[in-house]
């Protein structure tokens, strides 16, 4: 890893020389490409500098521990060393992700659809918790977050929630969130203290780029209905027909949006979701045809595949696809997802490399 990092740091210096040359502005496409590369390599350098700094502190603490006699100081140093090791491990996971070569689709925006599954009200509440988790994660990454559609449950949380997230490396880091997320905890309404298990499903749909010619939707293939928006319990919240339902007749895909007061805005959001779903359906079809792609994936990305368990009583989160278990669920629910998303990106890349080596051997 060290050798690869040093190669990237050398490349960073080369990129900085190129983008500081005024002539680069004569080629906007090259400038855009170099700017993205510079941002990625700069982040790698920042994380690597943090690793070096943390490792120096760790080594200093170990040297101090070897000479320390005072029991209180020994206990303090041992605790600091344990925390330092955990931080270094976390930073290395982020580094591994940054060392994975970029994919042309890494920066595609995504639409995330969260739906309550088994568990009724508790599942709906967990959808709300995960919506907050992803919102906080988006904030820490500097991504733009917007609500596209939300169907609230009667006791709080959501039966369904659709959000749009845009920014650098959005698809790269969020694509492996697709699947079934299982939660184990004691509901607030549980008087016996029993742990209940419920689940939600998450779909991650990359939005087609504006110049993506593969997703063409003919207006003649659309059936558009308008109706009055309704809130929780079914009451009408608007006196005009602002809600929009769009049906794509060739595929049968149906999208409904009613969160905006403007019919025009609801239609625009519904079209975004529709395009993303149609693109996703086409990608799923291609992946099923390409066995090599399937075998190199981190899980199948299928909505029904159980990918992760959140156990609140143990403060534990486990990603079953890569055998990763962390005992910091409290931080994860506050949006600290980097250790998980980075590990998944790195694992997927190593699987792809291994699969390629097997084919060439």
Curated annotation (Swiss-Prot):
Entry protein name: Peptide chain release factor 1
Family: Belongs to the prokaryotic/mitochondrial release factor family.
UniProt xrefs under InterPro entries: PCRF (IPR005139), Pep_chain_release_fac_I (IPR000352), Pep_chain_release_fac_I_sf (IPR045853), Prokaryotic/Mito_RF (IPR050057), RF-1 (IPR004373)
Source organism of the structure: Chlamydia caviae (strain ATCC VR-813 / DSM 19441 / 03DC25 / GPIC) (Chlamydophila caviae)
Sorted UniProt keywords: Cytoplasm, Methylation, Protein biosynthesis
GO CC term, one of those recorded: cytoplasm
Pfam family, one: PCRF
Gene designation per UniProt: prfA
PROSITE patterns hit by this protein: RF_PROK_I (PS00745)
N5-methylglutamine modified-residue sites: 235
Chief localisation class: cytoplasm
Annotated compartments: Cytoplasm
Stretches the record annotates as Disordered: 287-309
Primary role: Peptide chain release factor 1 directs the termination of translation in response to the peptide chain termination codons UAG and UAA.
Coiled-coil boundaries: none
Post-translation changes: Methylated by PrmC. Methylation increases the termination efficiency of RF1.
SMART domains associated with the record: PCRF
An example Gene Ontology molecular-function term: translation release factor activity, codon specific
Disulfide linkage: none
Domain of life: Bacteria
